[in-house]
């Protein structure tokens, strides 16, 4: 399937082993496709980062979006899917998570699809939510 592709969405997690695997796939996409063999250029690549947690990235407990997209893989980010309980629930129920429209993961997949189809959408659920005034007051 990869050989005949015109575009590819590389899916990775914000952890080193997953990003390394994605880097190997990108190398294959850049060297082993029909387009490359026929000197028609490279296929268009997009990045989807799953299981992202902005709080953990902010604390440097996981790679950031820029670490992955700009510094390591150098592939534009199409979507970022936050870590969300609805992913496990959807899997257990045999339903696509995109149908969970009230959940952050469902909304983020919907945004990703819209961007892939050419629509401009802001990136949601990728920054640390500001603490409320009570949490700031009591240091929680």
What are the language-model segments listed below?
Residues 1-76:
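Conserved catalytic-core segment of NTP-binding enzymes
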Residues 14, 82-85, 104:
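Short beta->alpha linker loops
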Residues 22, 81, 109:
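Residue-level signature of catalytic and energy-coupling elements of molecular machines
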Residues 34, 123-124:
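Active-site phosphate-binding and catalytic loops of NTP-dependent enzymes
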Residues 68-96:
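Beta-strand-loop-alpha "switch" segments that mediate conformational coupling across diverse proteins
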Residues 91-108:
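C-terminal boundary of histidine-terminating zinc-finger modules
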Residues 104-123:
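Extended, charge-rich low-complexity interaction segments
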Residues 125-140:
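A short, charged, Gly/Pro-tolerant segment at domain boundaries
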């Amino acid at each position: 399937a990869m050989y005949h592709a015109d575009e590819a969405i590389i899916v990775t997690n914000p952890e080193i082993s997953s990003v390394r695997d994605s880097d190997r796939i990108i190398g294959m996409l850049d060297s082993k496709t029909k387009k490359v063999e026929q000197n028609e250029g490279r296929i268009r690549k997009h990045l989807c980062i799953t299981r992202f947690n902005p709080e953990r990235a902010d604390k440097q407990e996981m790679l950031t979006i820029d670490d992955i997209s700009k510094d390591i893989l150098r592939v534009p980010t199409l979507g970022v899917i936050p870590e969300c309980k609805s992913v496990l629930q959807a899997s257990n129920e045999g339903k696509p998570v995109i149908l969970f429209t009230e959940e952050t993961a469902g909304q983020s997949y919907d945004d990703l699809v819209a961007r892939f189809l050419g629509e401009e959408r802001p990136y949601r659920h990728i920054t640390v939510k500001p603490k409320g005034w009570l949490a700031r007051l009591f240091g929680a």
